[in-house]
Amino acid sequence: MVVLFKAGSLGPATNSFIIAATRRGQIRLYNILQDTTIPEPKRKYIPSSGTYPKGFRVSGTHVGVKAANTKYPDLALISSDKPCTAAAAVFTTNKFQAAPVQLSKVTLEQRKGKGIQSVVINSGCANAVTGKGGLEDARSMAAKVDECNGTSEPSTLVMSTGVIGQRLPISKILDKIPTAYSNLASTHNAWLATARAICTTDTFPKLISRTFSLPSSPGITYSLAGMTKGAGMIHPNMATLLGVLCTDAPVDASVMKPLLLHAVSRSFNSISIDGDTSTNDTIAFLANGAAGGQTIASSTSQDYAALQKVLTSFAQSLSQLVVRDGEGATKFVTVRVQNSPCYDSARRIASTIARSPLVKTALYGRDANWGRILCAVGYTDGVTEGTVVPERTSVSFKPVDGSPTLRLLVNGEPEVVDEERASAILQDEDLEIIVDLGGGDKGEKGLGGEEAVYWFCDFSHEYVTINGDYRT
């Protein structure tokens, strides 16, 4: 059963857009996220503490970008005490790029990845497809933050998320930016409030932090922190999804973009909720070097390899939180395509499976319909000739409890499936699907060693309800 409440129908205390699904206790409040609305199963993903990078301060401030939001943070500010030694970002590939995307790309190009000091983010309005006026609004936001930082050079990246085609209440935002700046802090609560401020239909704030060391400076403990938002319109191909990653490690601007591209390709570009690529997708990575040590300036150095490994693993953990908060989702699914002659083909196949509505609805219905998975493998575009050979292809389910893998198809031949066990496996929230290509036609089975992993969720009735009432 799904119960809908219109804005204002329950009085001022709940004057918000609420969609509640009793099947899993999910509650979706558009742009108004508070402790009382976070579903109990999702609370385990919210950190109670963290270790945050030196020299970064953050804040979450209430503006009221959407009129229904009368008290909760919807303006996030992330700022380094000193200009960052390096910054990079990966942006949406959608042709209708939002004004903040256009502006931030130009700013990074002008600064050549150096001297970026802040990121300002509003939720509640995407500032996308808003013409010259929207671009001017984004410029005004950046300029106001630069003014607070005491610099006349462009040093602020801008992000926005929310409804497409509407102008920002720019005066309200500009009036509150000085407040956001004065509220900057380095505490865990400040980081959590900032992560909350960028949420829209998210049911919980997505924030993680991690410490690491580098081979050249084993005595220094570095920190990496990141926040992201997204629950729908998620099929990035940087590629609504936003993310900011910050570290106090010393990184040269020349290697910043390759580090981020590698991490994003194996994390944020390897997730899917509904197959839609947003106009606003942006992942930014800032390094201020505040922890000291030797600067990472070469892509062949041990430090570079170490940071690349840490950053990629970190980005995967952060991006997976987006999938776990997929609109209406009841399952977190890992699809692993292995023994492919090349990585790109394996990734294309994994992406196609993750986007398939038939696969996603079968999983929601707890139906072990492996034919839909195989069908998606077979129609995948752009794979290398000979990658998919039916008589060498196998499909199986890997349970999360450590019990033996359930084989569904082996070398092109269907197995006699224990439907009761299959149904039991599909009762769990987490599931792994393994597609083994057997090396394609490059030799005997197993000689193709490339593997790609994608993370996605199922499609439920609630997904339709949430998006059918998105602007209502």
Swiss-Prot record:
<dbReference type="InterPro" id="IPR002813">
    <property type="entry name" value="Arg_biosynth_ArgJ"/>
</dbReference>
<dbReference type="GO" id="GO:0006526">
    <property type="term" value="P:L-arginine biosynthetic process"/>
</dbReference>
<dbReference type="InterPro" id="IPR016117">
    <property type="entry name" value="ArgJ-like_dom_sf"/>
</dbReference>
<dbReference type="GO" id="GO:0004358">
    <property type="term" value="F:glutamate N-acetyltransferase activity"/>
</dbReference>
<feature type="binding site">
    <location>
        <position position="327"/>
    </location>
    <ligand>
        <name>substrate</name>
    </ligand>
</feature>
<keyword id="KW-0496">Mitochondrion</keyword>
<feature type="active site" description="Nucleophile">
    <location>
        <position position="240"/>
    </location>
</feature>
<dbReference type="GO" id="GO:0006592">
    <property type="term" value="P:ornithine biosynthetic process"/>
</dbReference>
<dbReference type="GO" id="GO:0005759">
    <property type="term" value="C:mitochondrial matrix"/>
</dbReference>
<feature type="site" description="Involved in the stabilization of negative charge on the oxyanion by the formation of the oxyanion hole">
    <location>
        <position position="161"/>
    </location>
</feature>
<feature type="binding site">
    <location>
        <position position="200"/>
    </location>
    <ligand>
        <name>substrate</name>
    </ligand>
</feature>
<keyword id="KW-0511">Multifunctional enzyme</keyword>
<keyword id="KW-0808">Transferase</keyword>
<dbReference type="GO" id="GO:0004042">
    <property type="term" value="F:L-glutamate N-acetyltransferase activity"/>
</dbReference>
<comment type="pathway">
    <text>Amino-acid biosynthesis; L-arginine biosynthesis; L-ornithine and N-acetyl-L-glutamate from L-glutamate and N(2)-acetyl-L-ornithine (cyclic): step 1/1.</text>
</comment>
<feature type="binding site">
    <location>
        <position position="472"/>
    </location>
    <ligand>
        <name>substrate</name>
    </ligand>
</feature>
<keyword id="KW-0028">Amino-acid biosynthesis</keyword>
<comment type="function">
    <text>Catalyzes two activities which are involved in the cyclic version of arginine biosynthesis: the synthesis of acetylglutamate from glutamate and acetyl-CoA, and of ornithine by transacetylation between acetylornithine and glutamate.</text>
</comment>
<feature type="binding site">
    <location>
        <position position="467"/>
    </location>
    <ligand>
        <name>substrate</name>
    </ligand>
</feature>
<comment type="similarity">
    <text>Belongs to the ArgJ family.</text>
</comment>
<dbReference type="InterPro" id="IPR042195">
    <property type="entry name" value="ArgJ_beta_C"/>
</dbReference>
<protein>
    <recommendedName>
        <fullName>Arginine biosynthesis bifunctional protein ArgJ, mitochondrial</fullName>
        <ecNumber>2.3.1.35</ecNumber>
        <ecNumber>2.3.1.1</ecNumber>
    </recommendedName>
</protein>
<keyword id="KW-0012">Acyltransferase</keyword>
<comment type="pathway">
    <text>Amino-acid biosynthesis; L-arginine biosynthesis; N(2)-acetyl-L-ornithine from L-glutamate: step 1/4.</text>
</comment>
<keyword id="KW-0068">Autocatalytic cleavage</keyword>
<feature type="binding site">
    <location>
        <position position="240"/>
    </location>
    <ligand>
        <name>substrate</name>
    </ligand>
</feature>
<feature type="binding site">
    <location>
        <position position="229"/>
    </location>
    <ligand>
        <name>substrate</name>
    </ligand>
</feature>
<feature type="site" description="Involved in the stabilization of negative charge on the oxyanion by the formation of the oxyanion hole">
    <location>
        <position position="162"/>
    </location>
</feature>
<comment type="subunit">
    <text>Heterodimer of an alpha and a beta chain.</text>
</comment>
<keyword id="KW-0055">Arginine biosynthesis</keyword>
<dbReference type="Pfam" id="PF01960">
    <property type="entry name" value="ArgJ"/>
</dbReference>
<feature type="site" description="Cleavage; by autolysis">
    <location>
        <begin position="239"/>
        <end position="240"/>
    </location>
</feature>
